[in-house]
Amino acid sequence: MDQQTPPRARTTGVLLHPTALPGSQVCGSFGEPSRRWLHQLASSGIGVWQLLPLAPPDPTGSPYSSPSCFAINPWFLDAADLSSEGYISAEAMAALPGADAPVDGVGPLDFDLATQRSDALADALVAHWPEQDNSRKDAFNHWCANQAWLTDHVHFMVLHHQHHGPWWTWPAALASHQSKALQDWAAEQGDALLREKLLQWHLDRQWQAIHDLAKELGIQLFGDVPFYVSSDS
């Protein structure tokens, strides 16, 4: 007797990258813009939110060629949530580049301004980190210890910023990932390494909160991954 495959439930989805979500900052974020969007999907009976890769984009803004297949694009970090949680001050948030340039979800995204904003936000996170309580620092350290990709990514990002070019133009010992050279270099970096780690920790925290809300509302997140990791990675 032939067995028939039971019919699958049908649903509707929408493809919208978080960069296009309207909100109070230069680029759509994992804060209120994403929460509002998920509630709109749920109230409209739409069951799937499809996204492009969340990885850092290449210099053209494409997320399909990224320097990392694990890291998240810092543009998505929501400053308002960080301020309300006490990770940065209200004054620091108001001073961020683009504070007077909310995104409407219609016009083009200013890549340079989004990067300037995320850089300034990272600096504010480092500046306010010493005043955070031990429970937050313990959570951060625990997260870092469980991310096998994090150290290499952080080293790469800081070196890339310092040398203003692809890895094959760096000093040979660092470009070839020689352990002693990297250890000696890393020992002198201090806040520069902390800065990149804090960015990724907060991005992961905010993304997990969006993931949890989507599950609560019955919305499936249908993601994508970079086609390939950039040669400059």
Where are these regions (language model features)?
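Acidic/aromatic-lined carbohydrate-recognition and catalytic surfaces
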Residues: D2-S233
